[in-house]
Amino acid sequence: MAVANLTTEQAILTEVRKQNRNRRALRLWLGFVLLALFCLVLVGGATRLTNSGLSITEWKPIHGVIPPLSAAEWDEEFRLYQRIPEFQQLNSAMTVDEFKGIFWWEWAHRLIARGIGVIFALPLIFFWLTGRIEKRLRWPLVGILALGGLQGFIGWWMVSSGLSVRTDVSQYRLATHLVMACLIFAGCMWIMRGLSPHSNDPAPARSSRGFAAAIAIFALFQIYLGALVAGLDAGFSYNTWPLMDGAVIPSDLLIQQPFWINAFENPKTVQFIHRIGAYTLFALTLINMVIALRAAPWTTHARRAVVLFSLVTLQAAIGIATLLMQVPLHWGLLHQAGALVVFGFAVANWRGFYGEYPHATAIAERD
């Protein structure tokens, strides 16, 4: 009986070690995907800030990988751009060489997006076929892949909004595109965090998990507001802080009718709401940190709360600097990068209250 029990335990320990190796491989893969997604969002931000998003007027998922290679091909691409309102109303004096400058941003954004599809799908198939993916994770990962495919359609849906009447893309579609990217990022972060070892530190309070969820969700909402700011060029509306052109609450926030449309289409109102959102997120993370430090000091939960508050504080400082300098490219990109870092850490912090995914066996590996 003792020999049988020992044999069983050794078999279980072998299975646990194998599962740990598989989890390390999956974490490495998802970490690389997260890095690629981070780069994609930054290039997308640069595409928006340089007004390059409408430079490619056709959607060619396969053939579009190859850029123009000859003068004739560049002339043809430029002729397509000359047909849209952005060129006719804003850039009619643009030359082919100047067009190339905006073309490459949009082309790079689309190329990276396609590349992410490959580096997600192919390893997913490999890990699935070789049995390295636990059953509980298979369909969530397939769901993320499906969201990636949907994101491609959303991207073209966004671009198409600026090809016929408008001289830019719809701020609503831009916000949808960015939020979807963040949801894909969050899904990868959630699973990767669940595959990572967790501490056994108790939560600071019963409400800690819910509070962490609220912070992550509000951070995503703040990113949505930031996308509206970018889509409306609202960062140029008020370039003073802490007051908005000398007022705490400007007088022209509700000038459009119906009044609720101001929250989405009035650049000044959108910037005002984004500022209020920043103050709210700062307050939420401050309260979260104070609760954690008082209730469970020296725990991983408290340390995460401190890091999260520090990241939000730094992001707020970057946002203020970007505003005061009237949104220079590098500072605008830094602010967008900071938003994704804050959101990613908020999601990881939220997932940290659930613990590591259970192992397939009930026997833990002993030293």
Curated annotation (Swiss-Prot):
Heme binds at residues 274, 335. GO terms for biological process: heme A biosynthetic process. One of its GO terms (molecular function) is oxidoreductase activity, acting on NAD(P)H, heme protein as acceptor. It comes from the Bacteria. Its cofactor is heme b. Belongs to the COX15/CtaA family. Type 2 subfamily. This is Heme A synthase.
